[in-house]
């Protein structure tokens, strides 16, 4: 009797221990409850149709997008909290994303930066998961993948791809995590207060990563690049050809902290653009061959990292998905 109980106890312990080390299922291959669906067998065949169907409601809404490439140009202006989910086998990383929204037009052709955007978000409280957004125009002109022009926007394990002016973080508070941002010239730009965490920031040509446009001392906006990996696109030699940023407007404010800066970063670090600019550029506890600050230009000193509360506001936990 005692032997049987002992065997059962050992079996129970063994099963419990095995279960503890099994990887948790992080996939999303079907629509979360209550979401409308987009895809060949979904409620709608295009994302644009699904957005239009939301109408003037102010209720929380969600859209699940099945795997595929969607050649669309979208404007999101919904009055309620909207969540967009892309199909994936691993929600924690952009590397398994299967949904791409793409469009190809330059800003000169479209008439403005905003009009060139593949996705233009104008409404607050939008959360985007596991979706790739691209502008396929390439080099030669500004061509925006995403305009994020609203407050309390969250992007989780997404990809943004372009060349010049990829990600227009234009206004409001914005959060990007586990994502990939690719471009060459000013490819993260605007005057949002934006936090980038655990992101791959990938240069596909010589140029400048950030072009922040803060203009007044009363403007509380920051770009905080935290625990990110700066790198060159595969097969591209950019040694010394990339700058951390240049000021689109005179009081640009950017910090790189706890990030990996490789040898693609020019020793000067930062560059000029706006006439009379006095930008606030900071670096704190970075590593890598490009992290030496001894030859930096335009660099200000800072004694501690910037916090999420400073960049996103004291209430950020109310709208940021803390499971990432």
UniProtKB/Swiss-Prot annotation:
GO molecular function: pectinesterase activity
Keywords, comma-separated and alphabetical: Aspartyl esterase, Cell wall biogenesis/degradation, Glycoprotein, Hydrolase, Secreted, Signal
Enzyme type, top EC level: hydrolase
Residues at the catalytic site: 165 (proton donor), 186 (nucleophile)
Signal peptide: 1-19
A Pfam family of this chain: Pectinesterase
Record EC number: 3.1.1.11
Binding residue positions for substrate: 142, 246, 248
Transition state stabilizer (site feature) positions: 164
List of glycosylated residues: 285
InterPro entries: Pectin_lyas_fold, Pectin_lyase_fold/virulence, Pectinesterase_Asp_AS, Pectinesterase_cat
Pathways involved: Glycan metabolism; pectin degradation; 2-dehydro-3-deoxy-D-gluconate from pectin: step 1/5
Subcellular localization, as worded in the UniProt entry: Secreted
Record carries keyword Chloroplast: no
Keyword Lipid biosynthesis on entry: no
Main location: secreted
Main function: Involved in maceration and soft-rotting of plant tissue.
Name of the protein in its database record: Probable pectinesterase A
